């Protein structure tokens, strides 16, 4: 029986002291989130071993990053590996988690390249939950594929180049508040923070004046003062990297507005930089730097295409008072968490399960209904017989093209609880097809049936598939293999050698997160004329 653990510790070394109270409310939200998954569904399942929680958390979310990983709720031992800057926050967790035996959570502080690498390469580890950069996530994926022992799951949340669109119907005061909160709160050191703002050109002049005025009202200083709005970035290395980006924009004449930087400390002043579009951002700038682009009214779909083309898909914001536009944009944007007429940070798990897609993460969403099963052991049936021949690459590509018809189709829509005046919906969208590699036709058929039963798309192999094809084949979301460990390791290594999103080798039964993206849409219903559901209920 899956074991449910009690409340989380509240405590967060925020980029400003006032933010502690806000972040603490998020910490609390993570604690009961597992309750949204009926635990009776997991009677008889087993934990899949000790799990490494490998969190490269920047100063605002150390406790939350811990609490959004629930292997301990699935009866597993947990080893926390924290970066050296945030050891104290993890000590709070290791010492004070309510009701957890001493040997269940173990804190191993130290640098990722030493402690973390040793943990990930250990064959006794049953899974890894990681928050950090794409580069490090890729390195972990390769290490897991190359080590001895069973193939184990990796859940990665890897940030993004997050955008917001403001059209000419948006309420300017509301939009500016949402932008300032999204871009500059916690000194921009949230994976969900706003990086690229698109403003309709009809309103850009007056809107920019209002935005820069709001920036001028921000107070920079020590995080311990309640009056502080923006504190320092995490360290001097981060400060110098961000400062170099700002200096390049200044040299190119694209610096639109910048606050005065304090004389001491690792501060970066909130900064506004002009860009032609999101494609100008080659990487995420993890700090209080906002990039502004404009668009014409008939270019909305082109803007959406540009945002999707980055390959990232974590958070997205929209400011508009046109309901049809809300529907159109949220139907087309490929992002895990979308926010309408509010800021795009501070997801409340249980109402807003959090996590991205593509380059922004593997899924399933933290705090969502499909998260806990990933930490359980879903044993595959007895392995099938070996293939007698090989499947050609051309045949695989043809089958993938046919199977991916209807990709991104919404399979279901779940209404989640939330405060009055806010709508929260979680939708499931079909991923690219899963390759069902057998071995053997009967096994491949059983794999495909398991995928389709979850709403996913599948391609059944008709012969042996060479491992190196998994490195170059496009149009799939991973592979199922219920055969020998040696061949499975070759498949895992081929998938880990890919560039782009992390794709899994599944050696047990597939789960919902393997076959579907989860996309959440949060709407401030008061911004478009009031809460119709509330008014209707009162009548």
Task: Identify the residue ranges that each predicted region occupies.
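Short beta-strand and adjacent tight-turn residues that come in two discontinuous sequence segments
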Residues: 12, 31, 110, 130-131, ...
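ALDH superfamily catalytic-core signature
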Residues: 99, 115, 121-123, 127, ...
């Amino acid at each position: 029986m899956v074991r449910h653990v009690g409340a989380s510790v509240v405590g967060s070394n925020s980029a400003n002291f006032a933010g502690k109270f806000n972040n603490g409310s998020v910490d609390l939200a993570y604690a009961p989130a597992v309750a949204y998954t009926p635990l009776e569904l997991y009677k008889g399942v087993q934990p899949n071993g000790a799990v490494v929680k490998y969190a490269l958390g920047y100063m605002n979310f150390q406790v939350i990053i811990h609490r959004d990983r629930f292997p301990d709720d699935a009866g597993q031992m947990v080893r926390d590996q924290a970066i050296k800057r945030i050891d104290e926050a993890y000590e709070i967790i290791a010492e004070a988690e309510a009701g957890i035996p001493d040997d269940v959570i173990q804190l191993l502080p130290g640098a990722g390249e030493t402690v973390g690498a040793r943990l990930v390469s250990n064959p006794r580890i049953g899974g890894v939950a990681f928050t950090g950069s794409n580069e490090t996530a890729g390195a972990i994926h390769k290490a897991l594929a190359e080590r001895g022992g069973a193939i184990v799951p990796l859940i990665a949340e890897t940030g993004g180049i997050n955008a917001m669109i403001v059209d000419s119907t948006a309420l300017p005061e509301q939009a500016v508040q949402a932008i300032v909160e999204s871009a500059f709160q916690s000194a921009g050191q949230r994976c969900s923070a706003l990086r690229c703002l698109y403003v309709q050109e009809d309103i850009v002049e007056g809107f920019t004046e209002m935005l820069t005025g709001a920036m001028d009202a921000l107070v920079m200083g020590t995080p311990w003062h309640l009056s502080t709005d923006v504190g320092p970035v995490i360290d001097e290395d981060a400060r110098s990297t961000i400062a170099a980006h700002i200096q390049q924009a200044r040299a190119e004449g694209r610096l639109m507005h910048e606050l005065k930087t304090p004389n001491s400390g690792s501060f970066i002043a909130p900064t506004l930089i002009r860009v032609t579009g999101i494609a100008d951002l080659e990487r995420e700038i993890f700090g209080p730097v906002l990039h502004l682009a404009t668009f014409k009214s008939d270019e909305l779909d082109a803007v959406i295409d540009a945002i999707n083309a980055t390959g990232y898909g974590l958070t997205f914001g929209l400011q508009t008072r046109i309901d049809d536009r809300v529907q159109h944009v949220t139907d087309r944007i490929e992002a895990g968490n979308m926010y309408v007429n509010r800021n795009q940070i501070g997801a409340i798990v249980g109402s807003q399960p959090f996590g991205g897609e593509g380059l922004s993460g593997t899924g399933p969403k933290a705090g969502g209904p499909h998260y806990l099963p990933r930490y359980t052991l879903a044993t595959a049936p007895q392995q099938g017989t070996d293939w007698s021949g090989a499947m050609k690459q051309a045949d695989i590509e043809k089958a993938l093209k046919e199977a991916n018809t209807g990709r991104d189709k919404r399979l279901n829509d779940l209404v989640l609880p939330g405060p009055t005046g806010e709508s929260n919906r979680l939708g499931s969208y079909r991923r690219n097809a899963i390759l069902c590699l057998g071995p053997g036709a009967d096994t491949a058929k059983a794999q495909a049936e398991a995928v389709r039963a979850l709403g996913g798309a599948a391609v059944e192999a008709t012969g042996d598939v060479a491992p190196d094809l998994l490195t170059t084949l496009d149009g799939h979301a991973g592979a199922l293999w219920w055969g020998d460990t040696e061949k499975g390791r070759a498949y895992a290594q081929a998938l880990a050698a890919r560039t782009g999103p992390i794709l899994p080798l599944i050696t047990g039964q597939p789960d919902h997160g393997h076959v579907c993206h989860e996309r959440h849409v949060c709407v401030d219903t008061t911004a478009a004329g009031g809460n119709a559901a509330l008014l209707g209920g009162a009548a």
